[in-house]
Structures are given as C-alpha cells and as structure tokens.
Amino acid sequence: MLPQDTNTDPLPGDDAESASGKSADASQGTPNPGDEVAHPRRIRSFVRRAGRTSTGQQRAMDELGPTYIVPYQPEPLDWTATFGREAPSILEIGFGMGETTAHIAGLRSQDNFLGCEVHEPGVGALLKLIGERGLQNVRIMQHDAVEVAAHMLTENSLDGVHIYFPDPWHKKRHNKRRLVQPPLVKLLASRLKPGGYIHCATDWEEYAHQMVEVLSGEPALENTSKADGGFAERPDYRPVTKFEKRGLRLGHGVWDVVFRKK
C-alpha cells in the first residue's frame, strides 16, 4: 500500500501493489539539491499500518534482506552496481504484499525493479517470493519513495514508474493526502528518460479522474490513451489481483492510467 501520512485512518487491507522499467546508471547525474516535493503538507508515499510479520517473512528478511534490501542514503543510486548489470530501470511505489511486483519481475526479466515499501510484513512477503521464484531483478528500499525519488534517483534515469492502488483518501477533507499530486508527478517526470512511462491503477473512480487530470497537467508527459476519459487498457504485464477480482465481482471498476514522457 502506498504510504502517505502517519496521523490517519488505517488503510484498507489489500490496497497497493506495483511494477515497470528501463536501464540507467546513476553516475549520469546527481539529484538537484532543491529537488524536494513542495507541498503545503508533506506527502509521503505510505501510510503507517499495523501488521505482524510472519515467521516465514521474518526468515526471508534475515536470510535475503542483506542481499535484496538497499539501504537508503541521500546520494545517487548506482543502478549497475546495485543490480550487477545494466538494464531498464523501473521504480515501484508501494508494492503492498509484493505479489504483483514478483509477477511482473518474473515476466520482465530483462528489466530491473526497485520497489519502495515501508510496511515490514510486505517487505518480508516480497523477499519470500523472491526466494521462492529465484528472482534476481528485484531490489527493495524500505523507505519513503518520495525521498528516494528526490535524493537517490537522478534526472533521466528511469524507464518506468508503477503506482498501483494507492490509498484513495476518499473523504473529501483527506484528498490533500493523496499521493498522485502535481509536485510528485513533476519530480517523477524529471527522473524519467524520454519515452519512459508512469503507470497508475486505482479502483476509486474519482481518484482515477484526478490522476488523469494531474498527469495531463505536467507538460513533460503525454497520455498514451485516446479513449474517452483518458483511461488505458490494462497492460498485459499487470496481473489482476485477488483484491481486484473481488471488487470486479461486486461490480466495482478498475482504471489504468498510462502517461509517457515526451
């Protein structure tokens, strides 16, 4: 799930997963000192959630964490050193319990995936999947993705960004806490290479329209969809999650939004 503010209602259980990518070496540039996401109320990419780490998740943390968890440090990330190869680089913001990330990483073995998630059971769950499936192209940053993007990712270094099912903050007075807002979109657009993409998905229709509006307002981006409303077909690489299937059975919609850097 995507983190955002700590003094908030708890998140609905199943609400975030991620994926996307193309190669970049962080030595190409450095983050600008002023690259902060300016917002009257600082937006975070996550919400603090209670949750118990299972025995299997903890074992994965202990055994695989040292290899696959990348420590946060406010300096440019060297993608080649981090992954041991040059490949397209994808940032995943809020991967929840990691099933979608693991699925996409398995399908797209040619890409490198950096997943940001602060929820420890989710980190442990993805590490467990990495071990079970032998995934070599995933690394995890257990830190706020907004700070990672601002201070560790350089301009023109990403091939894609995935933001799947972020908290919709459905109460009107909480809308300002939503993740997809102009300051973050501007920051992410600066980190994308020309031709790189931002792929969002949500099951909250009003938030879906806001996503299209906010992304359309960023001059560096263009919508890949010409359909009414600006929504895209679900790309083949994004699986339908259990949470999503349940919603679809109940008649709830899901909207994909895909924009590309000009």
Curated annotation (Swiss-Prot):
Chain residues that bind substrate: K171, D203, T241, K242, F243, E244
Binding site for S-adenosyl-L-methionine: E92, E117, D144, D167
Region: Interaction with RNA, residue numbers: 173-178
Database matches in InterPro entries: SAM-dependent_MTases_sf (IPR029063), tRNA_(Gua-N-7)_MeTrfase_Trmb (IPR003358), tRNA_methyltr_TrmB_bact (IPR055361)
UniProt-annotated catalytic positions: D167
Region (Disordered): 1-58
Stretches that traverse the bilayer: none
Positions with biased composition (Basic residues): 40-51
Pathway of action: tRNA modification; N(7)-methylguanine-tRNA biosynthesis
Annotated Gene Ontology cellular component terms: tRNA methyltransferase complex
Enzyme Commission code: 2.1.1.33
Keywords: Methyltransferase, S-adenosyl-L-methionine, Transferase, tRNA processing
Family: Belongs to the class I-like SAM-binding methyltransferase superfamily. TrmB family.
HAMAP family: tRNA_methyltr_TrmB
Record function comment: Catalyzes the formation of N(7)-methylguanine at position 46 (m7G46) in tRNA.
NCBIfam families found in the cross-reference section: tRNA (guanosine(46)-N7)-methyltransferase TrmB
Record-given protein name: tRNA (guanine-N(7)-)-methyltransferase
UniProt source species: Cupriavidus metallidurans (strain ATCC 43123 / DSM 2839 / NBRC 102507 / CH34) (Ralstonia metallidurans)
